[in-house]
């Protein structure tokens, strides 16, 4: 409805008038809570992407050359779906998605969601600042956001995609009872489709059940939400909702002191749980409603496409808007002629061709360095008829043949070594049993 049921603007007893209300006036960096509204909402709503689409969580730079880092600092997870990106708050996956759909589209959606503190080409101390850039995906913006506006954006998702401006009053009358201000209208603006809202809700339920927000659960109530933490721990958030209410909590210091490890860094989630568990007392647990145009479809988890017989144990069921259900079949799992040297599908003149199966995983270095034919953009080895006809190809093939033989010998040696170690271990165990007897 847009009605604000409760608001806390600071700690302790209010001791004055016109004091800082951190819920309506403070502007803070939103961290990963912004991933949902800046990136995944537009990606699913109008960019043709789905929760099953995959991106590679691997080394990636912003356009200015600065590397994008995940919040867990080191290592990469390889191929990940958009659902994984939401559940585990993956920075690299999210930036890649916004890069594809363009920061401009993300910025336009944020304006529809009701944010008033974003800028596009503002001058500050002789420099021009704009929030229309890749860091928008992670909440890296010029000024920040207001709690009440962030909460309203999540309430929009909870409301089936309809934005209603937050209401702090209903009706104002004069001393004669005449209505001066009427704020009871519940009309809103459709920002995202109901199907998009459901998909976001489904993914954010994973955040609460198995992702970064498990601490907010209470009483079996259906909850969807997203955590948010700035890189320097100045701001920590949780924004989420149930079928009844939406709530956003922020913790931090006015002077930007870093929140300390332990209790301070988990306070936003604990506060959210404490508040929401009270306002839901006496309310029945119920599920989020599912629009009629949502379809459940089995896909290959490594391609996000319809599975083939080769996909094996990588199958999963995902929700789709009816008009985005995959029609293409998996192109990750391959069976056919394989180049024994490169591990890629064999080109037309490959001297190392053999029958086999393989996974065309994007994070695999040998796949990334493979050539692409102009005919069908299929990654194949370099041994095409054109390559084989080039001067010096014979010498290259001979070198590769020797390297392949060395690999084979090395593999045989390692297998022999493992066998000898197993025999030795068995002999030691047999001797120990004999000694005990």
Where are the model-predicted features located?
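A penicillin-recognizing enzyme superfamily signal
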Residues: 1-8, 13-26, 143-342
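Sec-exported extracytoplasmic/periplasmic mature domains
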Residues: 39-48, 56, 60, 87-91, ...
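Active-site SXXK
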Residues: 2, 29-55, 85, 153-157, ...
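Mid-domain, small-residue-enriched loop/turn segments at the edges of structured enzyme/sensor domains
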Residues: 66-71, 102-150
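Conserved catalytic neighborhood of penicillin-recognizing serine enzymes
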Residues: 48-106, 133, 175-206
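Low-complexity, Gly/Ser/Thr/Pro-rich intrinsically disordered linker/tail segments
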Residues: 297-417
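Short active-site loop at a secondary-structure junction
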Residues: 15-37, 51-54, 135, 139
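Extended amphipathic alpha-helical heptad-repeat regions
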Residues: 410-437
